[in-house]
Design a protein with these regions (language model features):
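Positively charged n-region of N-terminal signal peptides that target proteins for export
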Residues: 1-4
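Short S/T/G/P-rich N-terminal loop/turn motif that feeds into the first structured element of a domain
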Residues: 16-82, 86, 90-96, 124-126
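Short, exposed beta-strand-loop hairpins at the edges of beta-sheets
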Residues: 96-99, 109-116
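A generic structural signal for alpha->beta connector loops
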Residues: 61, 116-118
Length: 126
């Protein structure tokens, strides 16, 4: 009986999970797709993601996450990239400051450009 009660409680609690609220108006999402020169190379991917982690300290960033492509047969899905980066900024001014921040330009010049053959950026705001 205790096991049954525990399972029911676990089920009820898991159904109470909520998703995060929408980002505040004025925030900017900076989505960057990377195609590695050596597709799938784990050592290069680690260097790239380490560079991304070093960007977290730049003022104006409210969130930073990255990952790899999810394979898909759907024709509308582009899964040809190796790594995607998502950076959320508090506003457009923070995005523009980031673009010229020496820490960002250093990682781009020393790590990202040497290890990637293509970079595609999408920025959007609310």
């Amino acid at each position: 009986m205790k096991t049954m009660i525990a399972l029911v409680l676990a089920g009820l609690l898991s159904s109470c999970a909520t998703i995060a609220p929408p980002a505040p108006s004025g925030t900017v999402d900076h989505v960057v797709m990377f195609w590695q020169k050596k597709p799938g190379n784990a050592a290069d991917r680690k260097k790239i993601t380490d560079a991304m982690d070093r960007l977290r300290v730049i003022e104006g960033i409210t969130a930073l996450d990255y990952g790899t492509a999810v394979a898909s047969e759907r024709p509308v899905v582009d899964d040809s990239f190796d790594i995607a980066l998502l950076v959320r900024f508090k506003n457009v001014q923070a995005l523009h400051a980031y673009e010229t921040d020496p820490r960002h330009t250093k990682e781009v010049k020393e790590v990202l450009l040497p290890l990637t053959k293509k970079i595609q950026v999408y920025d959007f705001t609310r």
